[in-house]
Amino acid sequence: MKVLLFNGSPNENGCTDAALRHMSKVLTERNIQTEIFQIGRRVKGVCMGCGGCSDTGRCVIDDCVNEALDIISEADGYVFATPVHFASPSGDMIAFLDRLFYAGSSAMRYKPAAIAVIARRGGCTSAFDAMLKYPTYNQMPVVSGDYWPIAHAHVDPAQLRCDEEGLFTLSTLARNMAWMLRCIEAGKKAGIQPEYVEKNIWTNFIR
């Protein structure tokens, strides 16, 4: 089994990366393969609503989103991590997720997702809430911990070690991800599959 961990920080080796590496270690100890995918400064644009991905399964903007689309089907679960910028996820993370879920939602459907939010101080819960909108739109089980998935540090990744509760929460999140993956795998072996819906019902608020 494999978990793909997305780093939405512009700082490749910063605090968000340290949080993901902490979770990766916990997952690896439980025989879960991991890969950290750096989003950072590689996003070249926002979703334009052109619909091009509906025809090709790829975004017309050729950047790290298409790189992610090439590998998301290989993963059994996902962790989406972001720093907090003005009480929101990073702009690059939002642009990345908008396009990733628009083009590749079917490859991630029914697979568990976890969120991790890293900040110097405030704005964590509102950033966490924004990140939740993506997996909960896509029929993905959301992995929770013993507290909201928040850890604190500023610039220096070593500061993350000072937030003992935050690290414990991230560890719990990773342990629960491993447990959920094993549960899903056991269910599949027992012949239990998701109830696939052939066609959604679409209505507009304005008639």
Describe the role of every protein-language-model region.
Residues 32-42:
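A short beta-strand-loop structural module common to alpha/beta enzyme folds
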Residues 60-147:
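Helix-loop-strand module that forms the ligand-binding subsite of alpha/beta enzymes
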Residues 51-55, 132, 161-162:
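Short, hinge-like loop/turn segments at secondary-structure boundaries
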Residues 2-30:
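N-terminal beta1-alpha1 ligand-phosphate binding loop
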Residues 42-69, 199-207:
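Cysteine-cluster motifs in flexible loop/terminal segments that predominantly coordinate metals
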